[in-house]
Amino acid sequence: MLDKRDYTLIIDKSGSMSNTDRGTNKSRWEIVKESTLALARKCDQLDPDGITVYLFSGKFKRYDNVSAVKVEQIFQENDPMGGTNLTAVLQDAINQFFQRKKAGQAKGGETILVITDGEPDDRRSVFEVIIEATKKMNSDAELAISFIQVGSDASATDFLKALDDKLQSIGANFDIVDTITLADMEDMTLAEVLLSAIND
């Protein structure tokens, strides 16, 4: 559970995150903000170090030791704009984990939660980054990456399904990716999905 793992949240802040989907009265960005707050509050109780939060579009920014209070500030400082360059941010998060592991500072393992609404601009290199990471791992418990889709973009769903199904067939040593599309969420809110991901 939480006290045995480190958690990193990677949030898409590309321009389309300001869209509002049918059946909701909030933008994707607002929904993600509320859900991140719920997750941070839960983590505040369980892990006093806070969580690591990244925001990415064309470039990315990392925030360490994030508490619920800091989440508010992060979302105030950022507005959705730009593209979806997922490779650089994912590479940084994975590198951080391996650096901590090497220094003996990693807990039992790391879970990276990626919240995105579109297919990344760099689909192929996202696969490569994840496959490379699995080659440095000794067991599949060390690192888990969950991709969670917000919105209903069909190409995003297709990309996530490919990540979930094809990694090992194209060279990954372990299947470390789990994906949750909008359909998988059914009646769960994004906050509930995030909380269930850390309870696994």
Regions found by a protein language model. Give the residues of each.
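Acidic, low-complexity intrinsically disordered regions
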Residues: 1-200
